[in-house]
Amino acid sequence: MSEELSAATSYTEDDFYCPVCQEVLKTPVRTAACQHVFCRKCFLTAMRESGIHCPLCRGSVTRRERACPERALDLENIMRRFSGSCRCCSKKIKFYRMRHHYKSCKKYQDEYGVSSVIPNFKISQDSVRSSNRSETSASDNTETYQEDTSSSGHPTFKCPLCQESNFTRQRLLDHCNSNHLFQIVPVTCPICVSLPWGDPSQITRNFVSHLNQRHQFDYGEFVNLQLDEETQYQTAVEESFQVNM
């Protein structure tokens, strides 16, 4: 961090990073009792999963905080005024713009996994089926990590960090945040590999950070992964037409 920021405030650069997702804070919120700061989304997710404790120190959190945490507006203002270095390319960026910078920083994307922009569908239903039957190294890699579906109908995956299996996307995310938060080992993301646009050769250097950034929702809830691009487009047009009638 610049000397100007260190002299002007009592904050260090680490204070601008969320202890849950390990990324620059997005809509920071602060706990009343222990004064720890998190991304709002990370905090609410932790409250939904773990209940009444601070995700960092296990301190108490009130019922009101769990539903509506207090914004850390002082920290937001400082993030708008001062800059820090991109962890990959070292370019100086205002802290509040850092996440936007990551979307165009090739070094960051090479380090932490797939691009934040999902490519257009270019795989037809037939080619997906054919690919699933193929005995290439790519399909072997997919089978290594993706398993059967759970009783809820969601696909399940094997954790590449400990090989424990039968995790849904959400359970894998929770498991890794609880057990592997500070374990940084180059692995292949099993969720990415399972998607039509997944690249089995893509290595993710910080798997837990990658999960928190890229896999906060199930893609299957928003798109039919078995349909090709043209069918997806036509479906979206028809649904939009129905909504606006």
From Swiss-Prot:
Q: How is it modified after translation?
A: Auto-ubiquitinated.
Which domain of life does the UniProt lineage start with?
Eukaryota
Q: Which UniProt keywords apply?
A: Chromosome, DNA damage, DNA repair, DNA-binding, Metal-binding, Phosphoprotein, Repeat, Transferase, Ubl conjugation, Ubl conjugation pathway, Wnt signaling pathway, Zinc, Zinc-finger
Where's it found, cell-wise? Chromosome
**Record's SMART domains?**
RING
One GO process term, biological-process aspect: protein ubiquitination
Principal localization reads nucleus
Q: How does it assemble?
A: Interacts with NLK. Interacts with XRCC5/Ku80. Interacts with RBBP8/CtIP.
According to UniProt, the name of this protein is E3 ubiquitin-protein ligase RNF138
